[in-house]
Amino acid sequence: MARSFAQLARSAEKSSSSIAVPKEPLETAPLDIHTLGDDALRGDARRIGKVDERVRDLARDMLRSMYTASGIGLAAPQVGVHQQLLVIDLDFETPSTPPLVLINPEITTCSASVDTYEEGCLSIPGVYLDVVRPTAIQLSFRDEMGRPRTMKADGLMARCIQHEMDHLRGVLFVDRVTDAGGLKKELKDHGFLATDVRPITP
């Protein structure tokens, strides 16, 4: 049976295997985050075969880099690692709430209902635009210990997971923006090129 994010968080709080790191910005992030225009963002990520300490160390460094950049989600391809690994923390102001680590995530069900919400991305700093996505999802994944999990998510969590999972296929949120004029202006205003966008069909 699929569990909600809240249930997963409570389970992680009871577990000694949590990979949580201090939710504080560092003077220098351990990993560089690639930005729009870098080829590193456009490849397909590989599934992770063995979940070991190396994977957990990467997840920790991703979290440290994410907190340093004041983000709520980060995918491994954004730091130049083409593996199917995501870290998410929507409650970064609460130290006791563990982050969510998703390894080899697969969305199994999407809601028929969709909503529109403004998105941003650590790989396109300063740019915020509306994107349409399914309101709710169900997914399967492995946690930081390699255990198989399922969960349901809606609202911001569902959107964040979908956004980060796009990175595993070389897709950026700007590829989904339908307001071409607004997109071009936002990108130009923040030093990015519209030619680096690869529009996809919603």
From Swiss-Prot:
Entries under Gene3D superfamilies matching the protein: Peptide deformylase (3.90.45.10)
Organism of this sequence: Synechococcus sp. (strain CC9311)
User: EC number(s) per UniProt?
Assistant: 3.5.1.88
Q: Which residues form a coiled coil?
A: none
Q: Which residues bind Fe cation?
A: C121, H163, H167
- A GO MF term: peptide deformylase activity
Family according to the record: Belongs to the polypeptide deformylase family.
Signal peptide: which range, if any? none
Protein name, as recorded: Peptide deformylase
Q: Which InterPro entries match?
A: Peptide_deformylase, Peptide_deformylase_sf
**Gene that encodes the chain:** def
**Key words, A-Z:** Hydrolase, Iron, Metal-binding, Protein biosynthesis
Keyword Lyase appears in the UniProt entry: no
Active site, UniProt feature: E164
Give the reaction(s) catalysed.
N-terminal N-formyl-L-methionyl-[peptide] + H2O = N-terminal L-methionyl-[peptide] + formate
Q: What does the UniProt function comment say about this protein?
A: Removes the formyl group from the N-terminal Met of newly synthesized proteins. Requires at least a dipeptide for an efficient rate of reaction. N-terminal L-methionine is a prerequisite for activity but the enzyme has broad specificity at other positions.
